[in-house]
From Swiss-Prot:
Zinc is among the record's keywords: no
Textual note on the cofactor: Binds 1 Fe(2+) ion per subunit.
Physiological role: Required for the formation of a threonylcarbamoyl group on adenosine at position 37 (t(6)A37) in tRNAs that read codons beginning with adenine. Is involved in the transfer of the threonylcarbamoyl moiety of threonylcarbamoyl-AMP (TC-AMP) to the N6 group of A37, together with TsaE and TsaB. TsaD likely plays a direct catalytic role in this reaction.
GO biological process, one term: tRNA threonylcarbamoyladenosine modification
Cofactor(s) in the UniProt record: Fe(2+)
Localization (cell): Cytoplasm
Keyword Acyltransferase: yes
Protein name, per record: tRNA N6-adenosine threonylcarbamoyltransferase
Gene3D superfamilies to which the protein is assigned, alphabetical: 3.30.420.40
Top EC group: transferase
Length: 337
């Protein structure tokens, strides 16, 4: 079976073609970084308009890359949520229209399920059950995964997501959009322990996260110190260390509570080198294993949507024409396969 995947939940237009026997046949991605750079963040209306311009040309490019056409497809998968409602509507409208015109099923995919399953695109894939840390600009959550669609949310952010805190703190440091990766790069030049920020909610039981207070602490420190480059780097280092320590502590707690020794990290922040190193050390100490997608599949992409859509397609879980986009969509409400 072969499926087209469409991702348009935020500021990346991702298109992919996936074959359940041959694997990923095509992957096309357009980032809107230049569109939003002058505004310091994503402008929803501009994001939607750019998806309108880019989606169909990228689909044509994917067909050319894969050496196939619509007649070779068995379904079309699209991101139905969560995300920016206007951006979601673009991908949903195009995906459902193409599926209807080509007389093949449409499959509505949960964006975070796409991230959660992204490591399945690699050679070394995790077996069920595993613990998943989903950490991105819009979400931070810990999920126990017993199988596809069998998700138990163990904890999630009660305010800002980790990626959002990265981006907002980067903006306070005067870094250009997208700030998260730039803050991580700046942190490499920072001096350890010059500044020390709190590790939010680690002194309380449970697996929920909170990063707004950490962002506030960074804001106060920035305001009260000189704005020379070394000071900025030291603050970036302290901030990143605090976020990573918090995530690692929560992962260790989740693994200990469940007795599971397989950990998946996915989402944009999972590309952070220091986070990967820390979690690899943790899993080595626990005689377990950590899994994550290649860097290009950490951020939003069509490949993860195509893969997740294929699993739903094979299970006969299709989207009806009245299927709505869901800007808010709990991952633990999904149907099990």
């Amino acid at each position: 079976m072969r499926i087209l995947g469409i991702e348009s939940s935020c500021d990346e237009t991702g298109i992919a073609i996936y074959d359940d026997e041959k694997g990923l046949l095509a992957h096309q991605l357009y980032s809107q970084v230049k569109v939003h750079a002058d505004y310091g963040g994503v402008v929803p209306e501009l994001a939607s308009r750019d998806h309108v311009r880019k989606t169909l040309p990228l689909i044509d490019a994917a067909f050319a890359q894969a050496g196939c056409g619509p007649e070779d497809l068995d379904g079309v998968a699209y991101t139905a949520g969560p995300g920016l409602v206007g951006a979601l509507l673009v991908g949903t409208s195009i995906g459902r229209s193409l599926a209807y015109g080509w007389d093949i099923p449409a499959v509505a995919v949960h964006h975070m399920e796409g991230h959660l399953l992204a490591p399945m695109l690699e050679e070394n894939v995790p077996e069920f059950p595993f613990i998943a840390l989903l950490v991105s600009g819009g979400h931070t959550m810990m999920v126990k995964v017993a199988g596809i669609g069998q998700y138990e949310v163990l904890g999630e952010s009660v305010d800002d997501a980790a990626g959002e805190a990265f981006d907002k703190t980067a903006k306070l440091l005067g870094l250009d959009y997208p700030g998260g990766p730039r803050l991580a790069k700046m942190a490499e030049q920072g001096v350890a322990k010059r500044f020390i920020f709190p590790r939010p909610m680690t002194d309380k039981p449970g697996l929920d996260f909170s990063f707004s207070g950490l962002k506030t602490a960074a804001s106060i420190t920035i305001r009260e110190n000189n704005d020379d480059e070394q000071t900025k780097a030291d603050i970036a280092h302290a901030f990143q260390t605090a976020v990573i320590d918090t995530l690692v502590i929560k992962c260790k707690r989740a693994l200990k509570q469940t007795g599971i020794k397989r950990l998946v990290i996915a989402g944009g922040v999972s590309a952070n080198t220091q986070l990967r190193l820390q979690l690899e050390r943790v899993m080595q100490g626990m005689k377990g294993q950590v899994y994550y997608p290649r860097t290009e599949f950490c951020t939003d992409n069509g490949a993860m949507i195509a893969y997740a859509g294929m699993q739903r397609l094979k299970a006969g879980q299709f989207a009806t024409l009245d299927m709505k986009t869901k800007p808010r969509w709990p991952i633990d409400s999904l149907e099990a396969i």
